[in-house]
Design a protein with these regions (language model features):
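Transmembrane core module of solute transporters
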Residues: 46-100, 141-142, 259, 270-438, ...
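MFS-fold secondary transporters
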Residues: 130-132, 147, 392-393, 412, ...
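Transmembrane-helix exit segments and adjacent C-terminal regions of multi-pass membrane proteins
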Residues: 6, 10, 26-51, 55, ...
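Flexible interhelical linker loops that connect adjacent transmembrane helices
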Residues: 41-42, 224-251, 294-309
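C-terminal membrane-cytosol helix-exit motif in multi-pass small-molecule transporters
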Residues: 217-235, 253-258, 282-294, 551-556
């Protein structure tokens, strides 16, 4: 059967018996010589473990950096006299890390994973060191952008490398460790960030600067381990053309769209700035599609990948769930800090159930996938669970008990664990080995784009609604005797001044730090306003994520192979 297929492909007709035999012998000889190479495409467990430590160290850098900086950014802004510019430090990092994700994927398919991963870690270390000694918010934004150039490759390349050295059936177990790293960083980030911010100085260096300096030793350790241990079997250097036009058009297309997603609430979604960003972004992305169609297999994102049903459907699931679940996820720490009155450090600890849920979901899905070779059920269960928990989060109010928040956070985490890992495995199993890097990076890119747009849109909805909800809550409190009593208490004079400033428009909800020390009775209408606005966002998130259930159900359930049947890595 194999011989007939080869011959039919080659369109050989009217061949003599001796030609068939000669060709058959050559095929058999080729197969016998290459059987050992195919079997050795993947590494043994004892070889994988040290590599895994290096990959996880690099991944931990990127994951920790996002949460630790989020905790410290207000203090950093105050110290650098640029609190109003703090968003740019985050936006710059987000833009560069997002636009470089697909570039790392494609370039690693051409030049190899190891040199690109080492390059990514090195850039991240340099960016971290520069950020630690920033003298203004403008310079910090530039240095954070450099950090993002490295961060864009850390997660994508780590997943792609696992795809190179681990057979499809076993990938879920190892990739589960990566999900655990992200979960752990979400807890450690606020705790470590809170510790450094709370120090006036350490070894003569301002406390918040250690938020970035701590990345340097971790990065150097990861660099050493990866440099010494990472070896991908059957490495072959192949000459490929680099898709420069595709890279430029993608970059020019994504930057304005990401920028308007972050700043649209401030500019106004129909402002001149926003419309300009829309126009440049859409035109550039249209050009990107044209260039990619011309470049064929050399494209950064080969359009033929979308002909694969699994890749297309998982990409859609990634965008939708990225928007819904990460947009909804952004509400949890805000709820705990604004409505619950928790400090950033305490809020990080209160999100521990979410982390445990992610780890539980990843471990369960990883073991079952490894045992059965089937993955489809988990994205389906995960999207259903995410939808259900987001819907149940609409029950949150200003007086919700923490145990209920913890339960729903845990279930939300389980849903995340069931979606994040299996979707990557599904795509890696669907594409040829030569497309492993670009396919993995594409899934990550679509999820990041969804998360960026979703988070920005949900926060915009939150702050667009909170004013009206708070006003309604204040009107309902006018007849409350306890509220009137607190209003007349001279000890609450500063809180009353803040409330009056809000009502007259002299203050906004951009700074809510004063709520932590304010009288609880007086600010209860504000807490109600935020809680009601957040539940509205949770409802929208549930509706958005529910759409992904259909695409998860339609995703093919291809069985994962024991040793892999793809061609050896050729990069």
């Amino acid at each position: 059967m194999f011989l007939k297929r080869i011959l039919s492909i080659l369109r050989l007709k009217d061949y003599d018996y001796w030609v068939i035999q000669t060709f058959k012998e050559r095929v058999n000889n080729w197969m016998s010589k290459n059987t050992e190479n195919v079997n050795n495409t993947y590494l043994e467990h004892k070889e994988i473990v040290p590599i895994l430590i290096g990959l996880m160290s690099g991944l931990f850098l990127a994951a920790l950096d996002q949460t630790i900086v989020a905790t410290a950014i207000k203090t950093i802004g105050d110290d650098l006299n640029g609190l109003s510019l703090q968003a740019w430090a985050t936006t710059a990092y987000l833009i560069t890390s997002t636009i470089t994700t697909p570039l790392y994927g494609k370039l690693s398919d051409i030049f190899g994973r190891k040199p690109l991963f080492i390059w990514a870690i090195s850039i991240f270390i340099v960016g971290s060191a520069l950020s630690a000694f920033a003298t203004s918010m403008y310079s910090l934004a530039i240095y954070r952008a450099i950090q993002g150039l490295g961060a864009g490759g850390l997660f994508t390349l780590a997943l792609a490398i696992i795809g190179d050295i681990v057979p499809p059936r076993e990938r879920s177990k190892y990739q589960g460790y990566f999900i655990a790293v992200f979960g752990t960083s979400s807890v450690l980030g606020p705790v470590i960030g809170g510790f450094f911010v709370g120090q006036s100085s350490l070894i003569g260096i301002t406390g918040w600067r250690w938020v970035f300096l701590v990345n340097v030793p971790i990065g150097l350790l990861a660099l050493f381990i990866v440099g010494r241990t990472l070896h991908i079997p059957n490495f072959q250097k192949v000459n490929h053309a680099i898709d420069w036009l595709g890279a430029i058009s993608l970059t020019v297309g994504l930057i304005p769209l990401l920028l308007v997603a972050q700043e649209g609430r401030v500019w106004g979604w129909t402002s001149v700035e926003s419309i300009t960003c829309y126009s440049i972004g859409i035109i550039s992305l249209i050009l990107f599609v044209i260039f990619e169609n011309r470049m064929k297999d050399e494209a950064i994102l080969p359009l033929r990948l979308f002909k694969d049903k699994t890749f297309s459907l998982v990409s859609v699931v990634g965008v939708i769930t990225g928007a819904g679940m990460f947009g909804g996820l952004a509400m949890l720490p805000l709820y705990l800090q604004i409505v619950g009155g928790s400090s950033p450090t305490r809020a990080g600890l209160e999100l521990l159930p979410l982390t445990l849920g992610i780890m539980t979901g990843s471990i369960i899905s990883g073991r079952v996938i490894s045992k059965t070779g089937k993955y489809k059920i988990f994205p389906v269960i995960g999207t259903v669970l995410l939808t259900a928990t987001l819907f149940l989060m609409t029950t949150f109010n200003a007086d919700t008990k923490y145990w209920w928040i913890a339960v729903l956070s845990y279930l939300f985490g389980v849903g995340l664990g069931h979606v994040l890992q299996p979707t990557v495995i599904a795509v890696q199993n669907a594409v040829a080995k030569r497309d492993l890097g670009v396919a993995t990076s594409s899934v990550t890119l679509f999820r990041q784009l969804g998360a960026t747009v979703g988070t920005a849109a949900f926060i915009s909805i939150l702050f667009g609604k909170v004013g009206k909800e708070t006003q309604n809550a204040f009107q309902n409190s006018v007849t409350n005797p306890e509220y009137q009593k607190a209003l007349m208490d001279p000890n609450n004079a500063s809180t009353v001044q803040q409330l009056q400033a809000l009502q007259t428009g002299q203050a906004t909800f951009d700074d809510t730090s004063w709520l932590a020390s304010a009288n609880r009775t007086l600010i209860h209408p504000i807490l109600d306003g935020f809680a009601n606005s957040m539940t509205y966002v949770f409802l929208i998130g549930a509706i958005v994520v529910s759409a992904s259930i259909i695409f998860a159900i339609l995703t093919p359930n291809n069985k994962l192979s024991e040793r892999g049947d793809s061609a050896p890595v050729s990069h």
